[in-house]
Each structure stands twice: as structure tokens, then as C-alpha cells.
């Protein structure tokens, strides 16, 4: 009985293959799924092939097939890096607290943020102590409080992160100023103890 149709199914989409008489193969150009396969079992999309003859009998081969299954697995990588955003402090801010809580958010809408890649640097020095990473939809909200008071003056915080597909976000920075010293007031007139009429 002759083969009538051959179909390839992946990510819920079905594609019809065309017979190539010159090679004796069924072929099709199939677009990859639009989303990363990281969240799939084994981090790969599993496909299946269904061959149907003229009588309606069909044979299905999927990723669990011992011989051909590995050829039906597809790894799809996203190309968009995570998004980084500072919550506090804002750029150019003057802060009287020498140990401010640095807060920022890292999000990625596809393969997801790899929390092990989140890095904070204070004035170019990587923070090696632990900081808070709270899972939220699409990523993490993070907070870091310096263990040692920052000196008065300008400071720059930078943050970095990558997703599970290896896309690294461009480091984001914020510069602010610590100012813990109140202004000095000097009275120039009238002189102390002056009596006038």
C-alpha cells in the first residue's frame, strides 16, 4: 500500500511533508517554535512524524523511539537578553543613609533569568556577600544593603544578569551621592552680645 501523507508535528503545529522523487525522501522546511525550549522536558521540543497510507493506516514515530527519537528533538534558543531596571536609588540622587538598600529587578519573558548570573558591583567591586533574590513573574526582584557604610561622595552601582539560554544583558548602572554631613551655619552679623538701641 502506497504512502499517502507524511506529517511532522512539533509544538502543537502540523506540517505536511512533500515527497522528493530524486532522493526518495519526504521533506519540508519547518519554522522553529517561536519560544525557547528551555522549559520543555530535557530543554528540547519533542516532535513526531505520522505516515498514513491510502487505506488510512498510520504509523507514528516520536521522540521516545529508540532508533529515530533523538532526531526528533529540537533545541531552540532565544536571542533576547534579560531586562535590568533599578528601583532604588534613582540616578543623581542624594542620600543621607550611608547603607542604602539597593533595589532592582531582572526580567526575561522566555527562557527565564538564571539567578546564579545576577551580579552586583559597587564602585567596580563585585559584591561577594549574599543578597536577596525574590522570584516574581518573569524574573527576580533583588535587594542589597552594604555591610559597610559607604563613604560620603559619589558611588556607582552596576548590575548584570543572563538568561538560561546564555544571553547576557548589557550592564546597567546608576550613580548617586552619599551625603551624611549636615550644612554648617555661620552667623556673621550681628556680633555675639551686641546691644543696640
Show where each model-derived region lies.
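Extracellular acidic, Ser/Thr/Pro-rich low-complexity tracts
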Residues: 1, 51-53, 78, 104-112, ...
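Solvent-exposed loop/turn segments flanking beta-strands in beta-repeat/beta-sandwich domains
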Residues: 1-10, 97, 108-122
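Aromatic sugar-binding surface patches on proteins
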Residues: 21-34, 135-144
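Surface-exposed, short loops/turns at beta-strand junctions within beta-sandwich domains
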Residues: 32-45, 147-154
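Flexible, low-complexity linkers/stalks enriched in Thr/Pro that connect modular domains
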Residues: 65-85, 172-186
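Short, solvent-exposed loop/linker segments at the N-terminal edge
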Residues: 92-98, 193-197
Amino acid at each position: 500500500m502506497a504512502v499517502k501523507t507524511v506529517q511532522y508535528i512539533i509544538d502543537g503545529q502540523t506540517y505536511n511533508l512533500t515527497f522528493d522523487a530524486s532522493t526518495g525522501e519526504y521533506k519540508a522546511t519547518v519554522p522553529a517554535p517561536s519560544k525557547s525550549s528551555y522549559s520543555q522536558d530535557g530543554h528540547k521540543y519533542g516532535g513526531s512524524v505520522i505516515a498514513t497510507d491510502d487505506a488510512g493506516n498510520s504509523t507514528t514515530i516520536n521522540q521516545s523511539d529508540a532508533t529515530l527519537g533523538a532526531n526528533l528533538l529540537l533545541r531552540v534558543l532565544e536571542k533576547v537578553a534579560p531586562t535590568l531596571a533599578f528601583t532604588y536609588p534613582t540616578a543623581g540622587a542624594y542620600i543621607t543613609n550611608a547603607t542604602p538598600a539597593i533595589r532592582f529587578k531582572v526580567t526575561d519573558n522566555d527562557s527565564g533569568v538564571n539567578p546564579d548570573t545576577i551580579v552586583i558591583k559597587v564602585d567596580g567591586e563585585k559584591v561577594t556577600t549574599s543578597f536577596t533574590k525574590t522570584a516574581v513573574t518573569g524574573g527576580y526582584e533583588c535587594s542589597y544593603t552594604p555591610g559597610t557604610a559607604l563613604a560620603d561622595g559619589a558611588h556607582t552601582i552596576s548590575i548584570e544578569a543572563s538568561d538560561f539560554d546564555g544571553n547576557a544583558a548589557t550592564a546597567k548602572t546608576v550613580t548617586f551621592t552619599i551625603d551624611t554631613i549636615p550644612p554648617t551655619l555661620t552667623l556673621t552679623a550681628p556680633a555675639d552680645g551686641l546691644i543696640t538701641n
